[in-house]
Regions:
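Acidic, small-residue rich beta-repeat scaffolds with periodic aromatic anchors
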Residues: 2-67, 73-74, 78, 184-263
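Structural signature of eukaryotic scaffold interfaces centered on beta-propeller domains
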Residues: 38, 117-128, 181-186
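Beta-propeller blade repeat segments, especially FG-GAP/WD-type strand-to-loop junctions
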Residues: 71, 144-168, 205-215
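Beta-propeller fold detector
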Residues: 79-81, 162-172, 221-227
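Repeat-based blade/solenoid architectures
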Residues: 88-120, 171-181, 235-237
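Acidic/hydrophobic-patterned starts of short beta strands in beta-sheet-rich repeat architectures
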Residues: 125-138, 185-193
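Short glycine/serine/proline-enriched coil/turn segments at secondary-structure junctions
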Residues: 141-145, 198-200
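Short helix-loop boundary/capping segments
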Residues: 157-191
Length: 263
């Protein structure tokens, strides 16, 4: 069967795995520039310098510099993240199509943030104080390939020009928040889950500790731990056993009433 020249050109645009050949340019070192055209959260103009890597999972995960600018104040800040991802499907739409020329020319891709089905960042109240934090998704970087999240506290003082960003990525419980985390707004608690297998998982519950000092009002304290284990303190095998510890004055106190073997 003969293949015409146009068909041969079309085939030349794809790799053997069926992906566009220009994906090879997206090696984690080549920048893609994106400007979101809508005002985000009613107050931010955002653009991104992104270094997607087509060889990672999920495809296009990569470092990025996310630049925020307030629309009503002379405030700008940049968040650097390692696993930014918009999703390669976005670039299959004609208005956001990307190709080798777009990449080589460093053309800015103008995109509506609201068009992204699974947004790479969002704003949400992560510590029950009624103020929204900046939350950046790390796609598939959590345990068992769940999404993990970076949390940044936005500090402002009413009737002043004060504006500050606090990186909470090394502060518990914020540092271990992922798609398995449970938030209880009634009790002001966050429960972290650590997957270790059928009977080797654990949970930590943190309770919000409010402060009269606004700039330090974001902390939690560990109040309960639950461990599931199949060995005792001597290292001997035992039936799957649940251990519940309450944290009192910094000490772990076993709650024997609700601890014990499980089915």
């Amino acid at each position: 069967m003969a293949i015409n020249a146009d068909a041969e050109d079309d085939l030349a645009e794809y790799m053997d795995n069926g992906l566009p050949i220009y994906y090879q340019l997206l090696d984690g070192k080549t920048p893609i520039y994106i400007e979101f055209t809508d005002v985000i959260q009613g107050r931010y103009i955002v653009d991104v310098e992104w270094f997607p890597n087509w060889g990672l999972v999920p495809m296009f995960n990569g470092p990025a510099n996310i630049n925020f600018k307030l629309i009503d104040r002379d405030v700008k800040f940049t968040i650097k993240t390692d696993f930014f991802n918009i999703g390669n499907r976005m670039f299959s739409f004609p208005k956001y199509r990307m190709d080798a020329e777009t990449i080589a020319s460093k053309e800015v891709i103008k995109m509506k943030f609201s068009d992204i089905a699974n947004a790479p960042f969002a704003f949400g109240d992560m510590n029950f104080d009624g103020v929204k934090e900046l939350v950046i998704a790390n796609r598939k970087q959590g345990q068992r390939h769940h999404d993990a999240y970076e949390v940044y506290l936005i500090q402002e003082i009413e009737d002043t020009s004060y504006f500050n960003i606090i990186d909470l990525t090394d502060t518990l419980p914020y540092s271990n928040i992922d798609a398995t985390t449970k938030f209880d707004s009634d009790n002001k608690t966050i429960q972290l889950y650590y997957s270790g297998g059928a009977c080797n998982s654990s949970y930590e519950t943190y309770k919000r500790v409010f402060s009269a000092y606004p700039l330090r009002d974001y902390k939690f304290e560990l109040m309960r731990k639950i461990d599931y284990e199949t060995w005792d303190e001597n290292g001997d095998n035992i039936p799957c056993t649940k251990y519940v510890y309450d944290l009192i004055d910094g000490k772990e106190i076993l709650d024997e009433a609700i601890s014990g073997t499980v089915d």
